[in-house]
Regions:
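N-terminal intrinsically disordered, acidic low-complexity segments at the extreme N-terminus
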Residues: 1-2
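General helical secondary-structure elements
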Residues: 5-8, 31, 35, 188
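N-terminal Sec-pathway targeting helices
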Residues: 6-24
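Leu/Val/Ala/Ile-rich N-terminal alpha-helices, chiefly Sec-type signal peptides and the beginnings
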Residues: 14, 26-116
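Extended amphipathic alpha-helical interaction segments
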Residues: 102, 106-212
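Polybasic, proline/glycine-rich intrinsically disordered low-complexity segments
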Residues: 211-219
Length: 219
């Protein structure tokens, strides 16, 4: 009788031990999962808070496994977005753009200004293409297309969607903000193009004297 009780107590103890082990394993897995998700949340929030017009995306991947793939995809996408944004805005900071109306350039490229006008045409096309790309990159369909073909399951696609659409898409520039920036850049390009075109058309009626444009007295 006592042997049977001992056997029952032994089986019960074994069951309890197994249950405890399973619970601990489950808790351990849950902890690891939450830590990985926490890393994704942290990195997405960090990108959302950055000054996208000035800063660069940290491409270090802190998560691992499928979570790491999600983080890498997020950062690759946002790096492309940030680089495109900075390229679109960067034309105004280019030395060549700033020097278009300098005495040195007026003398070197005048009086027809073929190189300067071609440069402005090129920059206009590049800026327009960049702004169109930025608009497209903010669309949900384009965002989700970046994770397709990565060979990861629906769970990780869900995490990607959550980070991108809930945290990062709202941090992207709105259509109105992009249009304002685009108009400002176009206005700067157009003002220089207009002046250089005018000088090219009137090239018989002006000359550069001591770094200044002097027109004929009757002009």
């Amino acid at each position: 009788m006592q042997k049977k009780k001992k056997k029952k107590r032994g089986r019960k103890a074994a069951v309890i031990i197994i249950v405890v082990v399973l619970v601990l394993l489950a808790l351990g897995v849950a902890y690891l999962v939450l830590r990985q998700i926490g890393r994704l949340d942290r990195e997405a929030s960090r990108i959302a808070r950055m000054d996208m017009a000035e800063e660069t995306v940290d491409r270090t991947v802190y998560a691992s496994g499928g979570y790491g793939q999600v983080e890498d995809t997020i950062k690759a996408y946002m790096e492309e977005y940030v680089n495109t944004l900075q390229a679109a805005r960067g034309v105004l900071q280019e030395e060549e753009f700033s020097n278009l109306l300098s005495a040195d350039n007026l003398e070197a490229d005048g009086p027809g200004f073929e190189a300067s006008l071609a440069y402005l045409e090129e920059k206009q096309a590049e800026a327009d293409a960049d702004f169109e790309k930025l608009l497209k990159m903010a669309e949900e369909e384009e965002i989700m297309a970046a994770i397709e073909g990565k060979g990861i399951n629906a769970y990780f696609r869900f995490l990607y969607r959550r980070e991108m659409l809930d945290t990062l898409q709202p941090a992207m520039f709105t259509e109105e903000e992009l249009q304002t920036a685009r108009d400002s850049i176009n206005a700067s390009i157009e003002s220089r193009r207009g002046l250089l075109t005018f000088l090219a058309e009137q090239q018989e009626h002006w000359e550069l004297v001591n770094g200044r444009v002097n027109f004929d007295a009757d002009e």
